[in-house]
Curated annotation (Swiss-Prot):
Belongs to the universal ribosomal protein uS17 family. GO terms for biological process: translation. GO terms for cellular component: cytosolic small ribosomal subunit. The keyword Ribosomal protein applies. Part of the 30S ribosomal subunit. GO terms for molecular function: rRNA binding; structural constituent of ribosome. This is Small ribosomal subunit protein uS17. It comes from Desulfotalea psychrophila (strain LSv54 / DSM 12343). InterPro entries: NA-bd_OB-fold, Ribosomal_uS17, Ribosomal_uS17_bact/chlr, Ribosomal_uS17_CS. Keywords: Ribonucleoprotein, Ribosomal protein, RNA-binding, rRNA-binding. It comes from the Bacteria.
Length: 86
């Protein structure tokens, strides 16, 4: 009856913290235009993401995708590591 829709939200960001077991904090930055003045400003949001193999390190650029709630604050999962930190 209903098709299985697999399109999920994805975000690209950098890993800020990896001190938790099987979890990382990913900062996603975006540019927002000010309504009145038109200047572009950087805003960022931190997401808690699941990292089951503990592969991510601080400074890695990762692709995260939305998933079912895994804990109180975790709703994202690391899909791929796009760029390793040196």
């Amino acid at each position: 009856m209903s098709e299985n829709n697999t399109s999920r939200k994805t975000r690209t960001g950098s890993v800020v913290s990896d001190r938790m077991e099987k979890s990382v904090v990913v900062r996603v930055e975006r540019k927002v235009r000010h309504k009145l003045y038109g200047k572009f400003m950087k805003t960022s949001v931190k997401y808690l993401a699941d990292d089951p193999e503990n592969q991510c390190n601080i400074g890695d650029v990762v692709l995260i995708e939305e998933c079912r709630p895994l804990s109180k604050r975790k709703r994202w999962r690391v899909k791929t590591i796009l760029e390793q930190a040196v």
